[in-house]
Design a protein with these regions (language model features):
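Short, surface-exposed linear segments at secondary-structure transitions and domain or protein termini
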Residues: 155-157
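Phosphate-binding loop of NTP-binding sites
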Residues: 2-125, 129-143, 159-160, 167-169
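Active-site glycine/GP-rich loop and adjacent strand/helix microenvironment
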Residues: 150-153
C-alpha cells in the first residue's frame, strides 16, 4: 500500500497515525495543528489529502500526521506509527468486509499490529466496541495504552474530572 511504501523511508518516531470510523479528519487536523506549533515542518497527509508516499519522496525527514482508513490499513505489513490514535469503531464500510463487523474491527486494529513497547495507542475508552477489541487483543498489543474518556476516570490517559481535563502520563499529572 501507499502507506506501507512511504513508511519504509521514515523513522517510526516521525509518525502519528489516526484511524477510526468517525472523527479521523477532525482529530488529524487538530493533532497537526498542535504538533505544527512546535514543529512547523509537520505534514498532514494520507486519507485527508496529500499522499504520504508522495510527501515522503519530497522530504522524508519531516514529522507526519497521517489519516489512515481501514482500506489503507488492509494493505500494511510493516507500518508501525510511533503514536496510533483510534477515535472509535462503529459499523461502516461493512460491504467491504463481507458484512462482518469483526472483520472491520480487525482492519482498524491493524494500526497497532507492528507497534513496539516504545509506541503508544491512544483510544476512546468510552467506545464499548473499541474497548472490547483492545481487551480481546491485549496479548498482541505491545504499545502503551493511553485511553481518553469524557465519561469515566482513567488511571493512565486523559479524562474529565469535575469538569476539568486531567491527563495522567508516566506518573505525571497535568490539569
Amino acid at each position: 500500500s501507499e502507506i506501507e511504501w512511504g513508511f519504509r523511508f521514515v523513522n517510526a518516531f516521525q509518525v502519528i497515525a489516526i484511524t477510526g470510523t468517525n472523527g479521523k479528519t477532525t482529530t488529524a487536523t487538530l493533532t497537526h495543528h498542535i504538533i505544527s506549533s512546535e514543529f512547523p515542518q509537520t505534514l498532514l497527509v494520507g486519507n485527508i489529502g496529500d499522499s504520504f508516499a508522495a510527501a515522503v519522496s519530497e522530504d522524508s525527514s519531516r514529522p507526519f500526521v497521517i489519516e489512515v482508513s481501514s482500506f489503507q490499513l488492509d494493505g500494511i505489513e510493516h507500518f508501525a506509527p510511533h503514536i496510533a490514535i483510534i477515535t472509535n469503531i462503529t459499523p461502516d464500510h461493512l460491504d467491504r468486509y463481507q458484512y462482518q463487523m469483526e472483520l472491520y474491527i480487525q482492519s482498524k486494529m491493524r494500526i497497532v499490529a507492528n507497534q513496539t513497547e516504545q509506541d503508544y495507542l491512544i483510544y476512546d475508552a468510552d467506545d464499548p466496541i473499541l474497548v472490547a477489541a483492545i481487551d480481546n487483543s491485549k496479548d498482541r498489543i505491545k504499545s502503551r495504552l493511553i485511553p481518553f474518556s469524557t465519561e469515566k476516570l482513567v488511571d493512565q490517559g486523559a479524562c474529565l474530572k469535575d469538569g476539568h481535563l486531567v491527563i495522567h502520563i508516566d506518573n505525571q499529572t497535568f490539569t
